[in-house]
Amino acid sequence: MAACRRCPLCDGRTQTVFGVGNPEARVLIVGEAPGKNEDLQGEPFVGAAGKYLNELLAIAGLSREDVYIANVLKCRPPSNRDPRPEEIQACTPFLREQTRTINPEYIVTLGNFSTKFILKTDVGITRLHGTLQRAGRFKVFPIFHPAAALYDSKKREALENDFATLGELLRGEV
């Protein structure tokens, strides 16, 4: 994986950002792609959105040690642009293998892009967030991306409510 050259993103990366966390997690969190800080540190969600994600996990009764965190793309797109279809195709086998190996009970998709990718749908995160979905044998729980709340305070309440619901699902209260 570290030497991957399957798409042009390899030319601009500092390193691949494969994923981090508990390899036997009940919850696999899937974001979009690494940002600048993630590319430098080699770990997903280490910037401001990552700090907020830690707070959100606590609302659900979780910590980073309880979950596995990955992205659809393993390399940073230039200027944090949206991933291109050929980049997604190049990275798909890696996320598929992570999902197969971890075999989570829940996949939490963060944001529009990962939600559409995992659920293979055109329906966006605004309609799907906070609702339990299915993708094959996996329960999928779409949630707004934590970065969205950094730019739009209205999303903060939705994020916190959705993570509270995730905690209830995990405890069997819903």
Predicted features along the sequence, with ranges:
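A polyanion-binding, active-site-adjacent surface
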Residues: 1-174
